[in-house]
Amino acid sequence: MPAHSFRIAAIPGDGIGLEVLPEGIRVLEAAALKHGLALEFDTFEWASCDYYLQHGKMMPDDWAEQLKQYDAIYFGAVDWPDKVPDHISLWGSLLKFRREFDQYVNIRPVRLFPGVPCALANRKVGDIDFVVVRENTEGEYSSLGGIMFENTENEIVIQESIFTRRGVDRILKYAFDLAEKRERKHVTSATKSNGMAISMPYWDKRTEAMAAHYPHVSWDKQHIDILCARFVLQPERFDVVVVASNLFGDILSDLGPACAGTIGIAPSANLNPERNFPSLFEPVHGSAPDIFGKNIANPIAMIWSGALMLEFLGQGDERYQRAHDDMLNAIERVIADGSVTPDMGGTLSTQQVGAAISDTLARLD
């Protein structure tokens, strides 16, 4: 019998989040049943543009108090620009979660699966398998700044970037700790110290200082422009890529999955490693209002994000790790069989793909 029950706040959000999140829960429940895990899901209807239209805000005032009692947040997608401007929907929900729950680690796995046509020539399964570790609360995505002389010819816009020693060091430590557990044990630091004369030389200095504590982990630093080029030309050289710049990380974490064939299956985790607050797990894709209601949304990213959630919650518990591995194996087999949605060349519906992965998982040895 399960020794501990994890409580999970399920927030579908907008658009296809409403369609893919139930499939993620379906597969998580199948994994829990197989491996003797106890998961409890409660669904919240806020953090959506429809809620904003009804209440004038994305979430209730006590949202943090409600969610603090949960171990994790399983999130679908947010934004519907025809209803609510993006900066309102994102800053009123997802970015609040990241900052107020100190989810300072953003994890974006990048992996080429069998059966997924690679966008890069002559790449095979195993050539692309790395992780982007992105600082999630600082960098360029701050709300510090303003507009001077607004609506005149002398208008000036200032947007500040924030890099703190605490923020820089803790994301570096997470990245080096992660690399130490991986087979290749290599960290690549994304920088631009030849162009950004203050923040990036500081980042380079802290990276070198952190690396000194990890003699068994090799590392290098690459400027963001050539790093993007090498994602395309030499993806096999990467293992753990660490980024303090939120802007650089945002770009790399979409470029990586695109190089591996599709952003449509890419997962992400927003972690508070100390577990003082719930961590959040979500697909990289957005709410895709244009396909909402057509039952063709790809649920794989949602399901893969659920696997990341189990791995994090388990804290090394073999049952949770096996459940994570089974979910990935089931995803891999379903993709290889061609049992996928139209965006990947298949004919299955959202629910049919979710059912196929759930059934495949149940049959794994």
Swiss-Prot record:
Which residues are Mn(2+)-binding? 225, 250, 254
Q: Provide GO CC annotations from the record.
A: cytoplasm
The reaction(s) annotated as catalysed by this protein in its Swiss-Prot or TrEMBL entry are: tartrate + NAD(+) = 2-hydroxy-3-oxosuccinate + NADH + H(+); (2R,3S)-tartrate + NAD(+) = 2-hydroxy-3-oxosuccinate + NADH + H(+); (2R,3R)-tartrate + NAD(+) = 2-hydroxy-3-oxosuccinate + NADH + H(+); (2R,3R)-tartrate + H(+) = (R)-glycerate + CO2
**Bound how, and how many: what does the cofactor note say?**
Binds 1 Mg(2+) or Mn(2+) ion per subunit.
PROSITE patterns recorded for this chain? IDH_IMDH
Q: Name the coenzymes or cofactors required.
A: Mg(2+); Mn(2+); K(+)
Looking up InterPro entries in the UniProt record yields:
ICDH/IPMDH, IsoCit/isopropylmalate_DH_CS, IsoPropMal-DH-like_dom, TTC_DH
EC number in record: 1.1.1.93, 4.1.1.73, 1.1.1.83
Q: Where is the signal peptide?
A: none
| GO MF, one annotated term | magnesium ion binding
Gene3D superfamilies from the xrefs? Isopropylmalate Dehydrogenase
Q: In which pathway does it act?
A: Carbohydrate acid metabolism; tartrate degradation; 2-hydroxy-3-oxosuccinate from L-tartrate: step 1/1; Carbohydrate acid metabolism; tartrate degradation; 2-hydroxy-3-oxosuccinate from meso-tartrate: step 1/1; Carbohydrate acid metabolism; tartrate degradation; D-glycerate from L-tartrate: step 1/1
Q: How does activity depend on temperature?
A: Thermostable. Fully active after heating 10 minutes at 65 degrees Celsius and retains half its catalytic activity after 10 minutes at 72 degrees Celsius. Inactive after heating 10 minutes at 78 degrees Celsius.
- What are the alphabetically sorted keywords of the record? Cytoplasm, Lyase, Magnesium, Manganese, Metal-binding, NAD, Oxidoreductase
Function, please?
A: Has multiple catalytic activities. Apart from catalyzing the oxidation of (+)-tartrate to oxaloglycolate, also converts meso-tartrate to D-glycerate and catalyzes the oxidative decarboxylation of D-malate to pyruvate.
Per the record, the similarity remark reads: Belongs to the isocitrate and isopropylmalate dehydrogenases family.
Q: Could you give the subunit structure recorded for this chain?
A: Homodimer.
Q: What is the name attached to this protein's record?
A: Tartrate dehydrogenase/decarboxylase
